[in-house]
Amino acid sequence: MRTILITGASGGLAQEMVKLLPEDRLILLGRNQEKLEQLYASHPQAECIGIDITDSSAVQDLVEELYQRYGQIDILVNNAGYGIFEEFDQITNEQIHAMFEVNTFALMQLTRLMGAHMKEAGKGHIVNIVSM
């Protein structure tokens, strides 16, 4: 059985991924834990965690806690992200920075933290799904 962590798990793409992973232990991250628990109540081995992945210290603490609990995580799927669908000249700098916090910086931090554990273990896979 593989242990797979998926970010952005309340979105449609993650919901489709989970359907393809019925035998795996899943760690599903999203902003709204209650929504995650409703979506994945029928998956026998899903742990739903509400977290803001732009909160660097919370992410760092979570990664350490998960590795203590599970020993290893086989696959990281960086699925969290969003786009801004407005006229380009109407997008504010604040919106751009917020989007990059989720789509780029949070992805890089989680990849760096979990990648270090995977490198130490000599195995692991990271899948990045990006939005812009």
Language-model segments: residues:
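A short, exposed helix-loop element centered on a Lys and neighboring polar residues
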Residues: 111-112
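Conserved NAD(P)H cofactor-binding loop of Rossmann-fold oxidoreductase domains
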Residues: 79-84
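The beta1-alpha1 cofactor-binding region of Rossmann-like NAD(H)/NADP(H)-dependent oxidoreductases
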Residues: 51-61, 93
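Conserved glycine-rich Rossmann-like NAD(P)H-binding loop of the short-chain dehydrogenase/reductase
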Residues: 23-37
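Conserved glycine-rich cofactor-binding loop
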Residues: 10-11
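Residue(s) in the substrate-gating loop at a strand-loop-helix junction
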Residues: 131
